[in-house]
Each structure stands twice: as structure tokens, then as C-alpha cells.
Amino acid sequence: MRGAFYVAIALLGSHTAAECNQDEPQGAPNNDFLTFGGTIEKMLPRRVLRERRDSKDKLTVHAGAEERVMDPPPEAVEQAIMKTAGVMRTDSDDVIARAAGAIRAHEEIEALFRRIDPTLYNVNGQALHALPKPTNYMVSVASDIPTVPAKRAKVKASADVINNAAWRVSKHDLRLAPPEPSPSSIASSGIRFDNQPIAEKAFKLDLNKHSDEVEIINSNSKRKRIDLTPSHVGEQAPHPLPELQKYKVSVAVSIPMVLATKLEGDGPTLIMRNAANIITTHDFRPAPFGSSTRTVASSNSQIHSQPIAQEASKFALNVDPNEVKSLFHENLPLVGHALHTRVGNDELVPLATVNSIKAGNTQGPYVHKPRMATDEEIHAAFLEAFNLPFHQYLYETSIMIKIVKRQYKTSPGNHRIVESFSSLVNNQELSKLKESLGPDLQNLLAGMLELQDDLKSLREAYYVKLLIMYELFYDFCYVRLDLFDALVPKVDRTVWILKLKNYETLPSHD
């Protein structure tokens, strides 16, 4: 509207200027220009209003024989007309150009086609794209439609077919129709789709011939993700796989300094720095679809393949870890009810000796305690819970279990732990240390061959490995209290290397 207003004013000014520049103005009875006051008589020509019979003009005019003239306007109107005429005379071309440019820009903005991202809405429980708004897609129709096809067809005049087509296109509403019914209703028998030959042939297909290849989807049902579980191992159902995102292990920043403080050294050594680099870059989450507890404990698994693990099955865990030296030379029986014989379902009848003759105890059946997990089961559960940074063998786990089951000073930050591992490490010879470290030897020594035969370096590497692994095993034991009979209250340490989070999310033991 503003552009049209500018154009109207420009045209009026141009017309006024053109009349002012005429060499021979219109004739008048008295003068060539109006005679009312001011300089306006020099700028504007005289206007003669001739009376007509059907004149409905209500303006006040002077009576005359053959013509009537208007009363002079007020002085304010004269000044306004003078200013407008002066501006229009000098800048009329610029005003017209600017007004025309504004009109064209406005028309171009309205004619822009914009892409509208479709929204989603639910149809029968399924998310479908919403149909666009009818006003979003604008189609321009040319005014000379009949001539365009005629020129392309090289015809002199437009034929009736072309004219009819042009008429239909110009009258047609090219906006989108309202949303159609859902796809399920399109296949009904009462609409146009079924009348097409292709649709009729499609419904004649015998789906029973390929029933396995036809997918039937219930529109009211929602697809659910099914968590896969591994197949049975040895005709026994394995433990459910843990959720990877729930196992969070915090790693300390100053690991070399913590190790140096525990070992009472002068400062971090190369082995301590290598160990810190290993665990800071390690992913402690278990691999997907890992081996189950029973498969880990099988004869082909890692825990029985090492010679040190085979010797661990002979150790009596009642022996204090400080006396671990004797464990290498003694062949003690396993802890258990070796003197009891099972009678009936759950009755255990101990045997008594009377005059060197064994006789059954007549004081009643022996009610045994609830069965607790063995070292092998605890070790297998520990391997299954985490992707450990170092190799953990059954012998090492057995020693750690004995430390945790003690009734005092079991926290990894206690000096008692250092003494317990000292007796174990100092008793190891060079060949045994190489077997105990296994593949971890290359990582802890960073490939330095000159240190592989150094007994002091190997003992330090094994010591560092045990201290790190016990930190993670200590938290694991207090998460899996179902694997232990009773433990002392857990100590929340301030100086640590590894710390486990999300205690409540670890899987339970069968």
C-alpha cells in the first residue's frame, strides 16, 4: 500500500509539472493563470469547471454565464501544495523508481518458495510424517497458457484441446487436498485404488505359497527391543550378561605417586609410570557377550591354564598371608566338610570314633550352613564383571579373598596389605615371577629386554600389579556380598588408585 501511495503522488506531481511547462496554457476569460494571492498563481494553471446538467458536485463555486471557478484554498493548503509540487518536480523520477523497486521487492518476497520440515503425528500407534499445509506450496500459473503449448507444438493457432487445458489449469486449485485416510484404509475395497488393473492383480497373489516371506505387522502393537542372551553352555543356563554402561571405574590422576608412597620409595619409577599409563588408557567395561561364569571356570579357560593356578588349588586359605612362604612347600587339604558323609537329602551325619571303630552319631542330623561361593566362582565372577587391565589368576584371587575375609585392616590403603603382598612377592623366584606376570611383563617393562632378567625389577612389577588389582577387587567384594559369608565394614579410603562406582548395579550370584 505504501508503494502504491508513492506512485500516485509521483504521477500527480509529474502531471502538475507537465502542465506548468506548457507553452500555451488553456484559455481563460481574464488571465492565463489564477489571480488569487501568493505565488501559487505563477505555478499552477487555471482550472475551469464547466457546469453539466447531471452535475452532483457539491463544492461551492461562483455563478457565471458559461464557466465556474473554485474558491481559493486556505493559506496552509497553498503552502502544502507548493512544497509537494516542488519536490515532485525535482525528484519525481527518483520517487517513482524507488516506489517501483519497493513494489517489486515485496512481490518477490511473497513469491519465494520455502521448504517446510514435516512434523510427526501418530496414526494407529505409528509415527508418520504430517502433510504440509496447503498454503505452504504455491504454484504460479502463466497468463498466456494457450500460446505457450501452441509455440512448442509449432501450431499457428491454439487448438480447442490446448484452450481447454489452459482453462482447466487456470481454474484448478493446485493446493494440496486435506489429509487422506491412513494407508490401511487405502487398501479397502470401496475406493478407487481397487479399481486399477495393477491393484486387482496384486490382490490375486497367493500369499500362502510364500508365507514365510510375508511379514504381518499389527498396527496396535509396538516393536520392542529384545535383549539377546547367550545359548546354554553345557546344558546349563549362564548368568545374564551385565549392562555395560553400569560399570564405572574411577581412575586416580596421581597413580605413580600413590604407588611410590605405598612402596616407600624415593619417587615414581619407570615401572610405576608404565602401570599408570596402562590403567589410565584402559577400558574397564566388559566386552559384549563375554564368557559366562561356568565357561570361565572350565578346564580350557585362563584360570587353570597357568601353573601357578594349579598350585593354588592345594593351598589352605586359613593360613595367614604373612606365612605364604609355607604355601609353596605344603600340600594341605581343601577347606570343607571332608569328614562328613551325605545321608538322605540334606542330612549330614558326622562319623564318631569309639574304641577305634567308626560309628554314626546318634545325636541327630547335622544342619550345614548355607553354601557359599568357592574361590573359583568368586574368581570367575570377578573376571566376568570387568575387562581387567592385568591378567588375574586364581592363585592371586585366592590370596586376595583371604585378605578380604580377615576381621581387621583389609582396606587397600592399610600398611597390613603391603606386608601381606611383600611375603608373596619376596618369595617368588625369577622363573616364577615371569610365569606370574605372563603377558603383563612386556607392558610393565615397556619392552625393555635388559629388565626381564632383573629379579628386583620383576618383583617391583609384580608388586605394583597386585596393589592395583587388589584396589578393584576390594570394591568388587563389597558389591557382591552374596559371594561372601560376612565381611568387616567397608572403609572409604581417601588415597586410592581405582575405585568402583554404581555399587547396586552389579549382577547377583546364583
Curated annotation (Swiss-Prot):
Secreted effector that acts as an elicitor that induces cell death in host plant cells. The lineage of its organism: Eukaryota, Sar, Stramenopiles, Oomycota, Peronosporales. A motif (RxLR-dEER) lies at residues 47-68. It comes from the Eukaryota. Belongs to the RxLR effector family. GO terms for cellular component: extracellular region; host cell nucleus. The keyword Signal applies. The RxLR-dEER motif acts to carry the protein into the host cell cytoplasm through binding to cell surface phosphatidylinositol-3-phosphate. Residues 1-18 form the signal peptide. Its main location: secreted. It is found in: Secreted; Host nucleus. Keywords: Host nucleus, Secreted, Signal, Virulence. It comes from Plasmopara viticola. This is Secreted RxLR effector protein 24.
